[in-house]
Amino acid sequence: MNREELKQILPHREPMLLIDEVELKGENLAVGKYTVKGDEYFIQGHFPGNPIVPGVIQCEMVAQTCSILLADQVKGHTPLFTGLEKVRFKKQVKPGDTLVMECSMTRSRPPFYFAKGRGTVDGKLAVTAELSFAIV
């Protein structure tokens, strides 16, 4: 799915649509990609001369990728974070990098959903997290 197809599912819009594409692999694995251009609002000032994608933005990228697994439930609704656990940042994500996110759902109790995700750059682990969110 490209950005235009993602907009048919997710309520996010620029500048907060933080995935470029997503591929569904089976029923419970979504693989998303985002290439950091360097002119994003979240890069400005974080940090001058050493731009790094903030960790909270990486978590949002993972969450948006996870939301695609629930396309039928998300359409017309808003997925909201209810929790982040076991978040770890292992590698800095910088302009020019492509963050590849892999997400799977671990359980659900509608309207609450639980997932785990990870992001890599050039095959090296950058971020891992367990997420929970509600669809309202």
Which residues does each PLM region occupy?
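Short Pro/Gly-enriched beta-strand edge/turn motifs at strand-loop
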Residues: M1-L6, D97-M101
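Short loop/turn motifs at secondary-structure junctions and domain boundaries
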Residues: R13-E14, R109
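Catalytic strand-loop segment that frames the active site of acyl-thioester-processing enzymes
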Residues: E14-V53
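A generic structural signal for short beta-strands and their flanking turns/coil linkers
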Residues: L18, N28-G32, I43, T78-E85, ...
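Conserved positions in beta-strands of structured domains
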Residues: D20-E23, E85, K90, S104-T106
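Active-site helix/loop of acyl-thioester processing domains in fatty-acid/polyketide metabolism
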Residues: V22, V53-G76
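HotDog/MaoC-like acyl-thioester-processing domains
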Residues: E27-V31, V93-D97, S104-V136
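Hydrophobic beta-strand-centered segment that forms part of the acyl-chain substrate-binding groove
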Residues: T65-V100, A134
